[in-house]
Amino acid sequence: KESAAAKFERQHMDSSTSSASSSNYCNQMMKSRNLTQSRCKPVNTFVHESLADVQAVCSQKNVACKNGQTNCYQSYSTMSITDCRETGSSKYPNCAYKTTQAKKHIIVACEGNPYVPVHFDASV
């Protein structure tokens, strides 16, 4: 079974590019990362930074998660991210996404030993 840490990497890490390559980026990535297999995942964020830099956020600014849990951490610096949001015309299995490039602080939930990101909570 896929670990929570591995799932985070599959769903949210794209270190190979510094930003979204085109307006079609989300359509391609959401499909290739299996985020449209059983349904269209409505919203998803990809982070264009090294895995080490994203894992390091787990020792940065401790903040409350959206659900009230206390194991969320905000990055000290802004990171290059791409937000993928389902469009109004999107219909499973033909999931369609709008690609939005940004530089923001990320907030991730961390757990385990080693203490690593397992959930992408927000960007600010």
UniProtKB/Swiss-Prot annotation:
| Active site per the UniProt annotation | 12 (proton acceptor), 119 (proton donor)
Q: Where is this region: Disordered?
A: 1-24
Disulfide pairs here are 26-84, 40-95, 58-110, 65-72
Composition-biased stretches, type Basic and acidic residues, lie in 1-13
Indicate the transmembrane segments per the record: none
Q: Name one Pfam family in it.
A: RnaseA
| Keyword set includes Glycoprotein | yes
Q: Which residues bind substrate?
A: 7, 10, 41-45, 66, 85
Q: Where in the cell is it found?
A: Secreted
Record-listed E.C. numbers: 4.6.1.18
Q: Which residues are reported to be glycosylated?
A: 34
Q: What GO biological process terms does the UniProt entry carry, in alphabetical order?
A: defense response to Gram-positive bacterium
Q: In which tissues is it expressed?
A: Pancreas.
Write the signal peptide boundaries.
none
Question: What GO cellular component term, any one, is given?
Answer: extracellular region
Q: Which GO terms describe its molecular function?
A: lyase activity; nucleic acid binding; ribonuclease A activity
Q: How does it assemble?
A: Monomer. Interacts with and forms tight 1:1 complexes with RNH1. Dimerization of two such complexes may occur. Interaction with RNH1 inhibits this protein.
Name of the protein in its database record: Ribonuclease pancreatic
What is the gene called? RNASE1
